[in-house]
């Protein structure tokens, strides 16, 4: 019996260590934000707001450029949070909103209005394809927002899942 318990504990700790190694940390989140804003400047985008959330939907970092409008932080968080909540990039959520508005409306009610069904919310996947977080960007057109997110993630060797 003690060997079985020790084995189970060892398996748990190995899994927990693997989870921590694949978790999104502050340094990486700040790099994602920095790179996304740099891409936005290269594209001459309107002032952007970038939010990075961990896999549990918790905000790690948020940056809002000078000139970004009032609700941009909530929109960026809503794009990233929606991607995490539904397990797909917000481009697919936007398509769902067009094809199944009652469903997305119901989900948004359950989410207390936190879901933003527009491109710019991109899942962040590790090398094994597991979701480790999401980035949400807003400020320019949804296509530009999404392009900044994808480029930032790819520049760091992360897998971007925009739902395309």
PLM region spans:
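Intrinsically disordered, low-complexity regions enriched in Ser/Pro/Gly/Gln/His and often acidic
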Residues: 2-3, 74
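Short, Lys/Arg-enriched N-terminal segments with co-localized hydrophobic residues
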Residues: 3-20
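Flexible, solvent-exposed loop/hinge segments and secondary-structure transition points
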Residues: 19-164
């Amino acid at each position: 019996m003690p060997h079985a318990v020790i084995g189970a504990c060892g398996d748990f700790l190995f899994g927990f260590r693997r989870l921590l190694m694949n978790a999104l940390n502050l340094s990486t989140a700040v790099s994602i934000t920095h790179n996304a804003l740099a891409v936005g400047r290269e594209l001459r985008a309107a002032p952007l707001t970038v939010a990075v959330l961990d896999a549990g939907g918790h905000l790690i970092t948020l940056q809002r450029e000078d000139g970004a409008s009032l609700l941009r932080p909530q929109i960026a968080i809503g794009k990233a949070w929606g991607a995490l909540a539904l397990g797909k990039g917000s481009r697919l959520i936007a398509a769902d909103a067009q094809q199944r508005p009652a469903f997305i409306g119901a989900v948004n009610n359950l989410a207390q209005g936190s879901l933003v069904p527009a491109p710019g919310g991109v899942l962040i996947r590790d090398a094994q394809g597991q979701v480790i977080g999401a980035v949400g960007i807003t400020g320019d057109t949804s296509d530009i927002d999404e392009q900044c997110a994808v480029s930032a993630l790819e520049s760091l060797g992360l897998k971007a899942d925009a739902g395309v």
